[in-house]
């Protein structure tokens, strides 16, 4: 089939697939080449909707190539900043170690005497693995009506579902690992205080040079409204707040605001609520395992294409959890 041949040629162009799919989904302007790709893709999808045939599973191949390119090859600035990133084979495993601390004790002793032994702790850490899977259907009617937009929407949303799950798991795991001590800064209220934010920034600046604060936009906005905070803002910072409603830095540390309107498929926020996280340098490693596999079944009786995205696997090792601190709100 000529259309299938053209689609396969398009799939060989790195980075093109998702750009076109995302622009079609979010109604962004296409250039001449992208319009041609969208037209070819549209004819391909409508033909599948008419015939109920896709013997080479080109929809699954399209989704698989696109999502793999975006998930495994495209940079993710925030996760790249707080984790050492890597990848291993589907059937491989890995391990890590915490930084060795000097816990040897020099005791006062009589000449020629003996003292209590002290030891160096060399702890081996195994990753915590997560495996995510997405399943859904596209109806033949939808393929005939909307053509390529049906597949573009599905592809874009599958990619976002995977990325959102990865981000949520990363911050949730670090959150669960910190239960007390100076890493936990509790505020007896619903908004951050100057004292709490100062404690967080001091903790981070004592431990790293490339630090970041991560929180929901509503708390990034609340930081600016803290009593007595305005006196610490430069004119440029005040202009930024008046324009965007958010602060971009606190005590020299970048503030990454996460939209509260953006949620996972099950309705959860992208990070736990009532939290302001701080990370000094890196908190550990994040390894992607293998690659995604996408399968499809043609269900002509119910006029649907069943799509299964499987094996989105990744593992965390929190080798430097001491570089993580959080402010908790009521």
Task: Describe the residue ranges of each PLM region.
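Alpha-helical scaffold segments that mediate packing/assembly in large oligomeric complexes
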Residues: 131-207
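Extended, solvent-exposed, turn-rich assembly/linker loops in the middle of proteins
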Residues: 176-248
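Assembly/oligomerization interface modules of large self-assembling protein complexes
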Residues: 52-132
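Sequence/fold signature of self-assembling virion shell proteins
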Residues: 34-38, 42-48, 229-330
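Alpha-helix boundary/N-cap detector
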Residues: 2, 28, 32-35, 50, ...
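Charge-rich, solvent-exposed alpha-helical interaction surfaces
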Residues: 6, 40-43, 62, 199, ...
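N-terminal alpha-helical "arm" segments
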Residues: 1-55
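Short, compositionally biased low-complexity segments
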Residues: 32-39, 127-132, 168
């Amino acid at each position: 089939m000529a259309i299938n041949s053209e689609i396969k040629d398009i799939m060989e162009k790195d980075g093109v697939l998702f750009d076109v799919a995302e622009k079609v989904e979010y109604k962004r302007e296409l250039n001449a080449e992208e319009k041609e790709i969208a037209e070819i893709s549209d004819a391909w999808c409508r033909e599948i909707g008419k015939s109920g045939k896709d013997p080479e599973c080109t929809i699954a191949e399209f989704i698989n190539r696109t999502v793999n390119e975006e998930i495994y090859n495209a940079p993710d600035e925030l996760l790249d900043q707080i984790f050492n990133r890597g990848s291993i084979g589907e059937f491989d495993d890995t391990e890590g170690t915490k930084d060795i601390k000097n816990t040897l004790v020099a005791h006062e002793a009589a000449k020629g005497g003996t003292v209590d032994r002290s030891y160096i702790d060399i702890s081996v850490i195994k990753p915590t693995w997560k495996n995510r899977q997405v399943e859904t259907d596209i109806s033949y009617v939808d393929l005939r009506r909307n053509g390529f937009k049906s597949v573009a929407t599905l592809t874009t949303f599958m990619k976002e579902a995977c990325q959102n799950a990865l981000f949520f798991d990363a911050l949730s795991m670090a959150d669960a690992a910190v239960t007390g001590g100076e890493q936990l800064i509790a505020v007896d209220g619903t908004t951050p205080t100057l004292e709490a934010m100062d404690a967080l920034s001091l903790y981070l600046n004592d431990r790293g040079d490339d630090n970041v604060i991560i929180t929901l936009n509503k708390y990034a906005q609340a930081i600016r409204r803290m009593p007595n905070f305005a006196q610490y803002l430069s004119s440029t910072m005040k202009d930024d707040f008046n324009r965007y409603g958010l602060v971009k830095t606190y005590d020299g540390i970048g503030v990454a605001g996460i939209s509260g309107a953006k949620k996972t498929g099950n309705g959860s926020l992208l990070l736990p609520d009532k939290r302001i996280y701080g990370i000094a340098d890196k908190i550990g490693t994040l390894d992607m395992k293998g690659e995604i596999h996408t399968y499809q079944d043609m269900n002509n009786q119910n006029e649907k294409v069943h799509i299964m995205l499987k094996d989105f696997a990744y593992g965390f090792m929190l080798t430097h959890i001491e570089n993580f601190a959080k402010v908790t709100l009521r």
